[in-house]
Amino acid sequence: MKAIRFEPSVPSEIRVIAQEAALGILKALHRYAETGQGRVKRLSGEYDGLLRLRVGNYRVLFDESADAITVHRVRHRRDAYQ
């Protein structure tokens, strides 16, 4: 399983999300870290090099190395790319 790391701003982004949705996001991250499965898409343009995990109405923007996942943003889909 890959380690999951968070940028300093991410915990505060997760705290403002409804508890049920936040738990779903964390479960989806753990599932991806363990199995590599999930609704993931490689991004381009301004976000080139990042991946997006889709969890309901939320988007998790992260990058991945051989041993870790670093989460950069967790936002509602309408705000994720602004």
Q: Locations of the language-model features?
A:
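Basic, Lys/Arg-enriched alpha-helical interface segments
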Residues: 1-54, 65-72, 80-82
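Residues forming the ATP-binding cleft of Hanks-type serine/threonine protein kinase domains
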Residues: 75
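Glycine-rich phosphate-binding loop
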Residues: 57
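NAD-dependent ADP-ribosyltransferases
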Residues: 60
